[in-house]
Amino acid sequence: MRVLGLFERGNNLNFADTYVYTWNKQYSFHENAFLISNQVATTIIIYLDKEIVNQVNEAFNLLNSNGIPALIIKSDHIGIFTSSNFTYDWQNKIIYFHEYTYYKNNEFIVSDEFWLNTSIQDLLPYKVLFFERGLRKLYEGEEYILYNTATDDDIIYKYIYEKDVIMSGNDYSKLYDTKSFKNFVHFMRLLRMRFAVPFDQLSNRVTRSRAFAKSKIHIGLRNESIPQALDNIHHYWINYSANGMRVSELKGSGSYSEKKISEFDIGQFKNYMNFLTLMFYIKNMKKKPSCTIIGAAPGYWIPSMKKYFNIVTYDDKHVDSTEHYNRYFTDDDIASVKTNGVYIDVRSDFKNYDWKKRRQLVEEETMRWLSITYKLLENRYVEAVLLKMTAMDIEIPDGYFVHFPTTYRKSEYYLLVDKQTVKRPKIKITKSLAYGAINTIFSDNVFISGKYSLKGKTEGVLALYCLSNTINPKEKVVQYANSFSGTCMTVRLNNTYILNKIIDFKTNADYTFLPSDFQCSIKTVLTSYRGYAGVFGYAITKDLKSDGNNHIYIIPNARDDDNFDTFASHLGLSRYSHSKRFSESATTMSGYLFRDMVSGKENMEDTDTENLASGHVFNAIAHYRFDYTYDIVGWLKLHKMRKFRVKSNIYGEHTDDEIRNAIEAAYVYYLLDGDEVGKEYAKRIMEIWDVQTWG
């Protein structure tokens, strides 16, 4: 949903699902905002004049803080605003569109410049374009700035990590005769144009920035947080991602099995991922990361990293780094290293030898660089080293096994060690064990750390999309959330129809939760992604899907004590019931009639004006799968404590009977639907209401 104000009237109705709202001057901006938010159209247009513009702006402020984008636009921008989903930074007047119209211009967009130095351009019938952070500026004026954030990065990543599975599927096989990158891109674009635009992924790139900057401890970071981690690299923070496999954890066996991973060179991708892995590992040591790279050329990714890190390079080819030595690194250079990280990516050219001699030389060279690594870690500056290894029988420190995909899978992997690691007993690793790992394990996350413990203080913690994991007992997660005082945490919403549903994934599983599971502080807001966006200064156009991958956002200290409606309020709460009522019900008054019938009312003559149950409470419970932005748990507690405050002239306090009747009506609604999860939710909401004493 989006609300657009226009000063110029024009042919603005030639858009599907658009409604022109007539501002009611008899109503306050609160009531107008409420009526606007509950329209079922996806685009609401309001024609403005000088008489109403101030009131409209007040309503727009309220809508935006509730995560519903509302702004005055230029009339010649009406097309893109009505046809594209976007995330609106209403604090800074920046609109981030998430749309792929550039496909009609035969463009392929990437956000990492090193892709321009590969053969991608030769393999595709599109023009490959680079925009830093994927931000393509469309317009800049006094009113606002427009960007498009859509890229094809995700297609490249899926190609690198998932192409074998995708291109072996029946759908792909029926459409294409060959397994090529060109066909893969075409197939993924087909899926995208089939209403599969990754809005959540694109929007999260924007909205997590503010939450990240406010946090000191990050749980469950993954690669999508790289931009925010880089932006805050000089501020204090650490992460707990429970990611990374130590050498001692490797199992299985294998043998040499060369495989071409990509049609185009992804060696730069591998080096970039390795570098970031090392830098963020050192960041977790509470130090400002810096790096010496030995064997850096061509290093196309290095120039973009110079603004975040001091990077010293050694190579006989030129590299655009902070400080470059146009020669090979030797033992004599060890004492002069002043960076706290060293990345060793050296492999001499032994192609003129037969394979036995070549293997001997590769192993000898590996041993030499391992010896240099030990000496580097005796240097008072160096904290950690990431070095290239080869599959061989060897004793090595119990460091982290790092193996990001590169163009060909052969015999190489990387070992991440630090000062403490090399002091512990070494691990014997066989050539067979190494090949088993190389052939089956690919790293996919640059954030390596230990597991986070759900104990202790939670100030400054940000935990997005990670704590539902069955690694932790469900009751411990609930206890943690109840006392959580960090920036924000999420748990997966149970929008299924199975009580206590556990959702399985390839390598793990998630518990599911209901808002009624928690007993958080009264200042904590429980809401949807839309509500979370509003709290952090954003608004989003995309409506929730009832069966989507949805999370409950638990945000401490977000409550506006003077005005509940500022964040996660009832705005937009009735959209689903309106839509269902108009399309499926016997009468548009069915909601009123249903609630009063359950409440035992016999005379229905005034049911639409003097009903016995709260419509807001009923909708929040009965239709939670479709919109759980409204913090019903917080509202009920504040209401009964008589601490509920709202700056509105349309609010009337509900009686105990009105709220009980609404909860009972929601229970009966679910009962008639055979919905066990819904019934349980209504029962728990009633328990929350019962246990709270009147203020």
UniProtKB/Swiss-Prot annotation:
InterPro entries according to UniProt: VP3_Rotav
Catalysis performed (reactions): a 5'-end diphospho-ribonucleoside in mRNA + GTP + H(+) = a 5'-end (5'-triphosphoguanosine)-ribonucleoside in mRNA + diphosphate; a 5'-end (5'-triphosphoguanosine)-ribonucleoside in mRNA + S-adenosyl-L-methionine = a 5'-end (N(7)-methyl 5'-triphosphoguanosine)-ribonucleoside in mRNA + S-adenosyl-L-homocysteine
Functional summary from the UniProt entry: Multifunctional enzyme involved in mRNA capping. Catalyzes the formation of the 5' cap structure on the viral plus-strand transcripts. Specifically binds to GTP and displays guanylyltransferase and methyltransferase activities. Has affinity for ssRNA but not for dsRNA. Capping activity is non-specific and caps RNAs that initiate with either a G or an A residue. Together with VP1 polymerase, forms a VP1-VP3 complex positioned near the channels situated at each of the five-fold vertices of the core.
Keywords: GTP-binding, Host-virus interaction, Methyltransferase, mRNA capping, mRNA processing, Multifunctional enzyme, Nucleotide-binding, Nucleotidyltransferase, RNA-binding, S-adenosyl-L-methionine, Transferase, Viral immunoevasion, Virion
Keyword Ribosomal protein: no
Subcellular location: Virion
Start and end residues of each stretch annotated as GTase/RTPase activity: 560-695
EC nos: 2.7.7.50, 2.1.1.56
Name this protein carries in UniProt: Protein VP3
Top-level taxon: Viruses
Region (N7-methyltransferase activity): 187-255, 433-559
Spans traversing the lipid bilayer: none
Subunit structure: Interacts with VP1. Interacts with VP2.
Lineage: Viruses, Riboviria, Orthornavirae, Duplornaviricota, Resentoviricetes
Family to which this protein belongs: Belongs to the rotavirus VP3 family.
GO MF term list: GTP binding; mRNA 5'-cap (guanine-N7-)-methyltransferase activity; mRNA guanylyltransferase activity; RNA binding
Gene Ontology terms describing biological process: viral process
Keyword Methyltransferase attributed: yes
Top-level enzyme category: transferase
GO cellular component terms attached to this protein's record: viral nucleocapsid
Record region (2'-O-methyltransferase activity): 256-432
